Design a protein with these regions (language model features):
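Generic structural signal for hydrophobic core residues of well-folded globular domains
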Residues: 104, 182, 251, 264, ...
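Generic surface-pattern signal
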Residues: 55, 180, 233, 249-252, ...
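Catalytic alpha/beta active-site cores
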Residues: 1-208, 287
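Catalytic-core signal marking the mid-to-C-terminal active-site face
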Residues: 206-265, 270-271, 277
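Residue-level signal for alpha-helical context at structural boundaries
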Residues: 115-118, 145, 261, 265, ...
Length: 289
């Protein structure tokens, strides 16, 4: 059924079984797209795999992040030990994102950040910054970010209780900031919001089928820690500090935190440093959440 067909009318050529979309002709006569959930180990290894996917015709890159990245901890943090580069790629700074998407035409592929919106905000901004370095305006970048934070609080208590970063209220605020930011700066970036009409969001629904791989590689953790050490040695400390102060002020007030967050990441603040500022202001969730 398409919106144009009207209620009670048959849909052609998208008749059951085998619907290929909500609007005729959608993908009739074209191969069904395949988007592989990818990202494992070091950024260089993930980049090599992304290049293979693009060379084979993939137009979308769903990026898997490791647990420390999803939690907002840098790879050299003690809490990250043993988890760096496992079940996803480790991203700590803009340098990592440059390597991850090096040689990837971001104007021609979409990027799906397999991380909740409250955790995906810095990675969304890092994608924007790297895209702009490639000469791709933010308005041309396409991708998606998840936003099912309430489901996360219900399920992660039993599945992955350490994976959420903030209590529910500031988490919802951060998601709302992501929505507003994307609407203003990155209109082709897909977000999901409550209260939308089904006709508006249903045509943009997608599903992901994934398999599980487990890899233990201490060398990845060591290499990532070395990258962070070099980054902190050469960056402008005062610029980073000033940007993080502005982020803290925004978090304490009502301004959209994504704008100062972008400035901090552009100044080579790490994802963990950004998250530490927000944790200082917003706190962390209790086990009672």
């Amino acid at each position: 059924m398409t919106r144009e067909s009207g209620p009670g009318l048959p849909v052609e050529p998208e008749t059951s079984p085998g619907f290929q979309g909500s609007r005729a002709p959608m993908r009739a006569g074209r191969p069904r797209p395949v988007r592989e959930y990818a990202g494992l180990g070091s950024v260089a290894e993930s980049n090599a795999w992304f290049k293979q996917l693009v060379a084979s015709g993939s137009t979308s890159l769903p990026v898997a992040f490791d647990l420390p990245s999803r939690m907002g901890h840098d790879s050299d943090s003690p809490i990250a030990s043993g988890s760096v580069g496992r079940a996803g790629v480790a991203i700590d700074s803009i340098d990592d994102m440059r390597v991850l998407f090096g040689g990837i035409p971001l104007a021609e592929v979409s990027t799906s950040l397999q991380i909740h919106a409250r955790g995906g905000a810095p990675f969304l901004l890092l994608c924007q910054l790297v895209g702009e370095e490639q000469g791709v305006a933010a308005g041309r970048l396409a991708g998606t970010v998840q936003s099912d934070v309430l489901t996360e609080y219900v399920l992660k208590e039993y599945v992955e209780p350490e994976a959420y970063a903030f209590p529910p209220e500031p988490s919802m605020r951060l998601i709302a900031d992501v929505f507003r930011y994307c609407e203003a700066e990155m209109p082709k970036w897909g977000t999901a919001a409550a209260g939308l009409d089904a006709d508006e969001f249903a045509p943009r629904l997608s599903f992901l089928f994934a398999s599980r791989t487990t890899v233990t590689d201490l060398a990845i953790e060591v290499r990532q820690a070395e990258r962070l050490c070099k980054l902190r040695a050469v960056r402008d400390f005062l610029r980073v500090n000033d940007a993080l102060v502005q982020l803290k002020r925004a978090a304490e007030g009502t301004d959209n935190v994504l704008y100062p967050m972008k400035e901090a990441l552009a100044a080579y603040a790490t994802v963990g440093e950004v998250w530490d500022v927000l944790r200082e202001v917003w706190g962390t969730p209790s086990r009672a959440v």
